[in-house]
Amino acid sequence: MDKISYISKIKNKFDEFKEDFNKPYNKNRRNKFIKTAFSSIVRTIFLFGLCFVILFPTIQQLLMSFRAPSDINNPAVIWIPMQWSIENYSISSLVLDYPKALVSTFTLSFISMILQLASTALAGYAFSRLKFKGSGILFLLVVITIIVPPQAVQLPQYVYFNNLGLLGSQNSIYLMSGLGMGIRSGIFIYIFRSFFAGLPKELEESAQIDGAGVFRTFWQIMLPNARGAIITVGLFAFVWQWNDTHFASLFEVDHDGFPLLSMRLLNVVDGLRQALTYKGIIGLVGQEVTDNPLFLALITNVSALMMMAPLLIMYLFVQKQFVESIERTGIVG
């Protein structure tokens, strides 16, 4: 009798569970939980895969950069060096003329960034608020500059700057940036125009009632509210100028008195022999350096890491503001 009663209780419990399980409310909650869990798993796998693709080569090159030059031809060394050394950084520093080139590159990028911000912000504000005859056509031409490669206009640019006597000087870069013709200026004008167009017109109307003119309204009202666009454009302008080789080569900006990291990295082969001769280790890998592509690739990678390091450090300090500004300006992709 007790056994039958026990089985009956189990059956009742099972029936209650089945009834509760099939209730629409619980069924919806269960389906929602499954979808959320599945979405989280897929998202996590995707992010791990993306991080691996991005971080794997960086970590690999970072470990290889501490490999002693004598281990270059050692097939047993794949990831972890057998002999740890900073000799590669010492050689790369000589190849890049690193301390001097770092200061020169930072100076060029920073001043160019400030000039780009000033010129493109003014142009973006004019296109968004100051409607004048032909403004639509002019803005269309600005958009076209985004898709036209800089190589298409390099010949007239070279001729004009040569006639102005600006070749071999960083003033050529400053002039282009200040006139809204710098690297990717069309994109920056588009960003500022879109941002200013999204601000309420009541801000300007209030300023005009108080007697503010166009420039005062721009400087005191519009620009302080464009913090997101300023951070976005500023970072892009700085990084793109930092990595530029096209205009630096076209206008012959790089020279012994004003070395640039990007150009020294581009010509690492030419500087490597001089650096090794200077250090008295031209045969440190057992043969002529030009005959050893592994050593050449190693020094190139180390030089790239040294060039990239200041940008990574800068990004660590501004990553929060940069992400917020990207969300405000609506840039995707």
For every predicted segment, state its role.
Residues 1-34:
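Short, Lys/Arg-rich, polar N-terminal cytosolic tail immediately upstream
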Residues 4-12, 20, 39-333:
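A structural signal for multi-pass alpha-helical bundles of membrane permease subunits
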